[in-house]
Amino acid sequence: MHVDTLKKIIKNLVYFLLVIFFYVNQSYANERWRIDKDISKISFEVPVLFTTNVKGSFKDIDGFVQLDTKDREKNKAIFSVSINSIEINYQKYKDLLLSPIFFNASKYPLGVLDTKNFLYTNNEISKLEIELTIKNKTIKIPINLKVNQLTQDLVQIKGKLFFLRSDFNIGIGNWKNTTILKDRVELNYDIFLFRE
């Protein structure tokens, strides 16, 4: 009887160790990093003929990065901005920007950057293609970015991308013309992520 009891204990111990091993292995397979909303910034600039460029930023941003250490091609990152949180140097035109003529923020409250997947090795992300979604329209855009590992649990991602406002119907009617308010938009990001 002691032998059977000992076999049961060993069997349960082996089962317990396998479960712990599987759990620990899975927890290291995925790393999740969340955006630090207090210090991260997403800003933009649109050239204007014969006057000061339109410059602004989004105060309400969110997002995360998921690193899959087992299959590095399954890494993903998603970031969003609340269109209503836009702040610009031409403050008197803010309502116009939020209106259906430009962003139609009541119907399309978010702008989204989604990588789907990317390869990350040795703090390097080479040129990558993201999907930018504005006003329910998605376009693939190549970007370059730099990753700075500040501490073991804090990373900074910096870079810029360019898109055409005409691709997303940002500016319709008289505002569709790109003679005065140019078509090319520069989007800059300085994002800080902390490990969860």
What are these regions (language model features)?
Residues Y28-E196:
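Low-complexity, acidic/polar, glycine-enriched regions of mature
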Residues V3-V14:
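Bacterial N-terminal signal peptides that target proteins for export
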